[in-house]
Amino acid sequence: MEKQRVVVAMSGGVDSSVTAALLQEQGYEVVGVTMRLSEEARDADSDGRSCCSLSSVDDARRVADILGIPHYVMDFTEPFQRLVIDYFTQEYARGRTPNPCIACNRHIKFEGLLEKTRALGAQYIATGHYARITRTDDGTYHLRKGIDAAKDQSYVLYHLTQKMMDHVLFPLGDYCKDEIRRMAEDYGLPVAHKAESQEICFVPRDDYKSYLRMHAPQTMQTGAITDRTGHFLGTHDGIAFYTIGQRRGLGIAAEHPLYVIALDASENRVIVGTSDEVFARALTASDLSWTLPRPPHEPRRVRAKIRYGKREANAWMDPQGDGTVAIYFSEPQRAVTPGQSIVFYEGDVVLGGGSIDHVTP
């Protein structure tokens, strides 16, 4: 019987390396692919912790040699620039906080890689994400949280459709991180104790403010800090320097603590308020993607997650007729941030998600 071929996205880290080893052990014909994303991503990190640095490519190639599998470097620089880097700078210019890792997962690591794997004759792609895909008797796929709650990455995968999940494997979803490092040792992989990669691979030293000064100088223009009524309180150094919920570094003398509660890019204004005003009861989200066979049309109770690393909260999801959803939280949520992703769960199953647009106090 002919082996099924799988392309493993190999970053040179321990997770993707063990993914390749596990699938080979399970009988797949494994092909390793490292994605070349940009010159900035390649040069951003000198200690090899960036997923795209030259040393990380070398690590991926070394692991492939040890496993005896072919390894290729594929060029994704054009779509990465257009769909990730440009999006990153444009969102900051709009007074929003982008999530470039989700954009990369969506457009590059899955949509882009799935398209290119056809040229390699592969039936599947696999990554080192800590998540699971299960299939019911009727053929419906469910994207689920990884077993390791501390490492679960289902939040960044809500864009996976039923069609895509038919060709995606997540071998690590049933394991904890410590187990993966032990497996890497058992397989004799040199990356067993390699440090985690940095969050924004194309930003040198993770200094996004310096990066924006160079690539999006319009976000660094000084402007007014006001309260909700428009009363002038001070001057800011550029809206990209501020995040929702921020207290420190405002440079305002006031009788009570003030926090950033909104960013108004149209007027280049940072809006501040009390700690109570940092909380929101509702929001609308757009640019929706659903893991379900069909998008939901009726209101339903969900667990909603408003940022990576934060626990889900009880909420009521009400699909609107214009391709957006309204979300009403059972309890007010702190620092709900436009531009970030909101992901909807039922139990450990991801229903879908979208981008936070408007926030209601």
Whereabouts are the PLM-identified features?
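AMP-forming adenylation/ATP pyrophosphatase catalytic core
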Residues: 126-133, 137-361
